Curated annotation (Swiss-Prot):
Record gene name: cmoA
Gene Ontology biological process terms, A to Z: tRNA wobble uridine modification
Function summary: Catalyzes the conversion of S-adenosyl-L-methionine (SAM) to carboxy-S-adenosyl-L-methionine (Cx-SAM).
Sorted UniProt keywords: S-adenosyl-L-methionine, Transferase
Source organism, top-level taxon: Bacteria
CDD domains: AdoMet_MTases
Protein name: Carboxy-S-adenosyl-L-methionine synthase
């Protein structure tokens, strides 16, 4: 993957545009997400491990909002269930193009990986096939809040008995003191990873209108309303968490 450092917000901008997954972001995305999301490598690799426990023969594994395909690669590293295939979906043409390049590279290094199809498209319009695993890895937070329940309901309808949705998200907290503390600790994490105060402030300004986090309680209530029977948090680092939702 690209080793280009994230310097997108290093210089003062007269007007900070809304964050978008364009070619500029794609170029630096691996560095950006590693330095911005505490626990990201652990979540991604273990998502593959978890998926291997739920994958069922002759079913689809979905990576929704696949970006550069890190989750898809983890699924292919860990899942060995007969007849499974991965469908990765993202609405950014730049992300999809680079994702395909990285997956071709994975194919050249390893044999007997799950077949994969990468689709450029809107996950809200996707016609789901019977699935045993669906991954939403830091994707739902970019979906309009009023559209989230319907999407989760459609995912629930597509899941086979014994399957799972694995949902990773940035969290907000209903307790003001808890929210302030974890926000400050997240900023400290970014400082420790080399981001300046200017970069942190401009990135926050760029993303606050396009990313709308929910609380853990909101996630749980929505997943149950969508028809899931059980919601199990399996990972949290600061204000980032991952959940398993069972049909």
């Amino acid at each position: 993957m690209s080793k280009e450092p994230d310097r997108l917000f290093a210089q003062p901008l007269a007007q900070v545009p809304d964050f978008a997954f364009n070619e500029d972001v794609v170029r630096v995305f691996p560095d950006m997400i590693k330095r911005s999301v505490p626990g990201y490598p652990t979540i991604v690799e273990n998502l593959g491990v978890l998926a291997a426990q739920f994958a069922q023969p002759n079913s689809v594994l979905y990576d929704l909002g696949s970006s550069l395909g890190a989750v898809t690669q983890a699924l292919r590293r860990h899942v060995r269930t007969d007849g499974c295939r991965v469908i990765a979906v993202d609405n950014s043409a730049a992300m999809v193009e680079r994702c395909r390049e990285y997956l071709n590279g994975q194919d050249s290094m390893f044999q007997e990986l799950l077949p994969v199809q990468v689709i450029e498209g809107d996950i809200l319009a996707l016609e789901f096939q019977p699935a045993s695993v669906v991954a939403l890895n830091f994707t739902l937070q970019f979906i309009a809040p009023e559209q989230r329940l319907a999407l989760l309901g459609r995912i629930r309808q597509s899941l086979l008995p014994g399957g799972a949705l694995i949902l990773s998200e940035k969290l907000r907290f209903n307790d003001d003191q808890e929210h302030a503390l974890l926000t400050d600790l997240h900023i400290a994490f970014k400082r420790a990873n080399g981001y300046s105060e200017l970069e942190i402030a401009q990135k926050r300004s760029a993303i606050e209108n396009v990313m709308k986090p929910d609380s853990l309680e909101e996630h749980r209530e929505r997943l149950l309303a969508a028809g899931f029977s059980k919601v199990v948090p399996w990972f949290q680092c600061l204000n980032f968490a991952s959940l398993i939702a069972l049909p």
